Amino acid sequence: MKPTPLLTGWTCRHLGDTAPGKPVTLPHDAMLAEPRTALSAGGTNTGWYEGHDYEYRRTLTVPENELADTHILEFEGVYHNAEVWLNGQKAAFRPYGYTNFYVDCAPYLHAGENELRVIARNADQPNSRWYSGAGIYRPVQLWTARGAHITLNGVKIRTLSLDPAVVEVRVKTTAPGTVRLTVDDLPAMQQESDGEAVFTLTLDNARLWTPETPNLYTCRVSFADDEVTETFGVRKVEWGTDGFLLNGKRYIIQGACIHHDNGLLGAVCDPDAVARKVRLLKENGYNAIRSAHNPCSKALLTECDRQGMLVMDEYIDHWYIHKTEHDYVDYFNDWWRQDLTDMVEKDYNHPCVVLYSTGNEVSETAQKRGIALTKEMTNFLHGLDDSRPVTCGVNIFFNFLSSIGFGVYSDEKAKKEAERAEKAKQRGEKAAKKKAVGSQFFNNLAGLLGDEFMKRGATLHGCDVKTRDAFANMDIAGYNYGIYRYKHDLKKYPQRLILGSETFCNDAYKFRELAKQEPRLVGDFVWAGMDYLGEVMVGSWEYADYAETFDGGPGWVSAGSGRIDLTGKPLGEALYTRVALEADNGPYIAVCPVNHTGDRHSPSAWKMTNAMPSWSWTDCEERKANVEVYARAARVELVLNGHTVGSKTLKNDCLARFSIPYERGTLEAVSYDAADHEIGRCKLQSAGGTTRLTLDAEEPTVKPGHLCYIRLRYTDENGITKPLARGSIQVQVRGGTLVGLGSACPFNKHSYLDSETDTYYGEALAIVRMGDGDAMTIAASDGEYSAELTVPAQA
């Protein structure tokens, strides 16, 4: 079938508005343009954005001679409770906001202009534990075919064996006929189809797909007048007591959890933003992504195939127990089979997908009904695709608490949360007075007590009792924050495979060292790889000069828990995990904000450090500087302006901490092996006295219509960032469109759709969509600094 993108020609308005809708281009996040107020029922979960229902409209023109053709609309993601109307008739309803779905248009079309209307609901707050976005936030396309054709998702490709490489291609057609197939490096072949044709291909000296060598093949299938092109990778996944095997060799999954938003763009699923996210995560040492806590986009799978990134595609955040009052629970029982079917259809041909997850922190797994459901969902996925293992992220401690009446999640708590939000809204009550419940309460408690609270709690005997039956009903046991159980449970359950489905950053080194010894410890996913909107303050160490309050109230917008911040900048924690996971041996230096040494900050268990790679702390001479060095070494030495100021032996971690008086100049870290030979060196240089505004584009040229990321920084004359320089920056764009502007600060009162932003530790980010030619970005700051940058259009 032939796809036609339907990205332009749309309007959007609040449902019920009488004024004409505003023109929008898909993908579109309607929620990002809403005000953020203390009366928002989504509250801390959604970053205080208000929730509304939306109506999208466009015209669909069908010529008379094409009316008898097959017409199928595909929506890759509409949040949520989507209704599709054609010519005044309801053609489809899909409640889940994160799955792609299809609409057969045949019963509703007529020749000429057809009215396509899509309703997306998001006024039913709270309905999510994080920023969901709203509207048609992923692409839409119209699939058409004339006469007999290959069915949608009708080409399925699977690697059967590796030596030699044998690949199976199954093709489903709507009628009998001849199916023709070509694959790179092989002669063309054909078969007769009676509705399905099965090809078995042998590829001599096949180029295997791995994260290190993401080789892809192209498969072209033709039938009648229809043609389908699919890419695939030759790779095989196996799992057992030898661990997780990729192409017959043990492979340690070293992953990061991510949410679906794209930072300053909100939930907009732009292919360029997705490609950038994958690139940044890979550059910082991760080889896998957990799509938390919903099926990922097609764009993400395409990029993970291309760049070499493993994917654990996760279905949902809850089953039949509410986490928020208006979440998906009311639809779950009727829809989970269709949802999983569509997730597998989307994932099947992608070599990057190596795991399916049925859910996240579903305390239902502590109950008899939930244990049976675990098995049912695992078996259902095996029936759709038995080439990939199935897991589920279980918070071991939460399961135990729920079994003794202290559950983090319950229908009653979700209802109370919604009632409190509604009463607060009616009274105009400030957010600070709203009582934290559910996961927010436990996140706050963990923030005060530290990560040990969660990890030690998971060692209680009852945690084993309330998880073992569910773990027996999945291929790989998913442990959320259960690292202190690994050794014990691997010994007690000799057939169990364990995946750290959600972990703290400071456990990366311990995980890596244990995984090298224990094959049945198959992997780890840190929370979180990249910062995200909503679930505010959960991972933030913020100070009073950037955050007006520490209560998570309005103004707070992001979690602050990413190893990479909201603008895509790797933090000290990213440098630590690079070394801990042995992406390289370092050394790296990061420094906690010297101007805040000893100051109180907002609490969080999901933050290991707020250190950053900078030695430019203006007016902080002689203040104590807390310096961190990350290295795989026997010893590290710290040198300031040519003088050794500290030396430490590294034991049981790849992190050494030093406290030294701040002094401008050159700070160096030198790493040594066990024989005291130098094996690595890095340095940070203080910025000079001159301050200027500097604009840097991430790419030297950008294709027309694509995104260009431009970092705005206060620097010295040599381009060294000055983190304590702070101001407001106004941005204009010529030859393009400013589509996002902001900083990484988790507390931010500006809209990311504004043309002005405050800086955060000397930096901000502008996202520009290129026009037809070169694009010029002009920035001015407080009447004192200005700069401009022209990015050439790529031919």
For the regions a protein language model found, what residue spans apply to each?
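Extended acidic/polar, glycine-enriched regions
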Residues: 110-111, 170-239, 657, 661-665, ...
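Active-site-adjacent substrate/metal-binding segments within catalytic domains
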Residues: 35-62, 66-75, 79-86, 92-95, ...
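Accessory beta-strand-rich segments of carbohydrate-active enzymes
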Residues: 2-16, 30, 46, 51-151, ...
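Substrate-binding clefts and catalytic carboxylate motifs of secreted carbohydrate-active enzymes
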Residues: 4-5, 11-18, 78, 125, ...
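Edge beta-strands of extracellular beta-sandwich domains
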Residues: 227-232, 676-688, 785-794
